[in-house]
């Protein structure tokens, strides 16, 4: 049982013991280091802040440079917080977090930000049917239709489905199975797809059930 921060490399197909092709996602989960230990008496809650990767110091702002130096680790690309219960182990400031805390066949939850689709209409965003394509109709094929009554209630209700920005939502995919772990290269291979585009960062947390 554990938790770690990873970078989505992409998808591929691998073969299992039954020689069946399985779609998998490859995640670069490391090197990860503890950059801050938050305590309830000081920050108000218990959590580990974890950073991933190493980047040039000049690419990081001065406040973050001091933050990383305090932890005694090199500047990273991304920071994320995990609850004490999620990591299920005692960690000190600057200590490494490895993929070896997971096991092959273990179920995990993957948290990430979905792909952004930009401004989308109601047919793409909410799966509306659109208007009829005959009987004199000329320009209403992809229109949303009525959004409310005129005299009563004389307003548009909150939450009415309309066109707008689609995607870039926080998504949690639960109970994915770890297909393979490669500790020497800090890689985790997970069955199925995970949220987000290539090179996006995801949190991998063992399921509580």
Swiss-Prot record:
Record keywords: Ribonucleoprotein, Ribosomal protein, RNA-binding, rRNA-binding
What residue spans carry the region label Disordered? Answer: 124-156
Q: Which domain of life is it from?
A: Bacteria
InterPro entries in UniProt: Ribosomal_uL3, Ribosomal_uL3_bac/org-type, Ribosomal_uL3_CS, Transl_B-barrel_sf
SUPFAM superfamilies, alphabetized: Translation proteins
Q: Name one GO molecular function term.
A: structural constituent of ribosome
Q: Name one GO cellular component term.
A: cytosolic large ribosomal subunit
Q: Name one GO biological process term.
A: translation
Family that this chain belongs to: Belongs to the universal ribosomal protein uL3 family.
Q: How does it assemble?
A: Part of the 50S ribosomal subunit. Forms a cluster with proteins L14 and L19.
**In UniProt terms, what function does this protein have?**
One of the primary rRNA binding proteins, it binds directly near the 3'-end of the 23S rRNA, where it nucleates assembly of the 50S subunit.
Q: What is this protein called?
A: Large ribosomal subunit protein uL3
What is the organism of origin for this protein? Pelodictyon phaeoclathratiforme (strain DSM 5477 / BU-1)
